[in-house]
Amino acid sequence: MRFKNRLFWIAAFIAFFVDQLTKYWVVQTFSLGETLPILPGIFHFTYVTNTGAAFSLFSGKVEWLRWLSLGVSLLLIGLALLGPVLDRWDQLGYGLILGGAMGNGIDRFALGYVVDFLDFRLINFAVFNMADSFISIGIVCLLLASLQKPPSSHHRPR
């Protein structure tokens, strides 16, 4: 039996694994609030927790985010299993989004928050994690996929 949408599953697994591994490393290595300058004033590892969405949007105790992560994950798994064979960019994009959604979703269900640690200070950006990065990269992949597809014609012949 041939495995349908193989790149989707590989991307999802790698994204999920990298996200969980990096969060585990941060929790084991740093105290909450501790920061390590990698490039001082530009990029730091800073251990914070986030009860909001990606990039600290909707900060606060937001219960619906755990269910959103679960719903997105289930929809993407259903698409990969039951839907058509996707092109490579779609598989990569949806797989990265699934890996990120599962990584943050598991944190929300198990901990009630997400571990964030990527701190770009040069642009004064919110602290985020690898799952957020994978979701963002996945969206870019889907945009690239949509640009490569020919526009569908909605004109009826006369």
Curated annotation (Swiss-Prot):
Its EC number is 3.4.23.36. One of its GO terms (cellular component) is plasma membrane. The keyword Transmembrane applies. GO terms for biological process: proteolysis. The lineage of its organism: Bacteria, Bacillati, Cyanobacteriota, Cyanophyceae, Nostocales. Belongs to the peptidase A8 family. Pathway: Protein modification; lipoprotein biosynthesis (signal peptide cleavage). The gene is lspA. It is found in: Cell inner membrane. It comes from Nostoc sp. (strain PCC 7120 / SAG 25.82 / UTEX 2576). The keyword Transmembrane applies. It catalyses: Release of signal peptides from bacterial membrane prolipoproteins. Hydrolyzes -Xaa-Yaa-Zaa-|-(S,diacylglyceryl)Cys-, in which Xaa is hydrophobic (preferably Leu), and Yaa (Ala or Ser) and Zaa (Gly or Ala) have small, neutral side chains. One of its GO terms (molecular function) is aspartic-type endopeptidase activity. InterPro entries: Peptidase_A8. The chain crosses the membrane at residues 7-27, 38-58, 67-87, 95-115, 125-145. This protein specifically catalyzes the removal of signal peptides from prolipoproteins. PANTHER family: LIPOPROTEIN SIGNAL PEPTIDASE. It is an enzyme of class 3 (hydrolase). This is Lipoprotein signal peptidase. Keywords: Aspartyl protease, Cell inner membrane, Cell membrane, Hydrolase, Membrane, Protease, Transmembrane, Transmembrane helix.
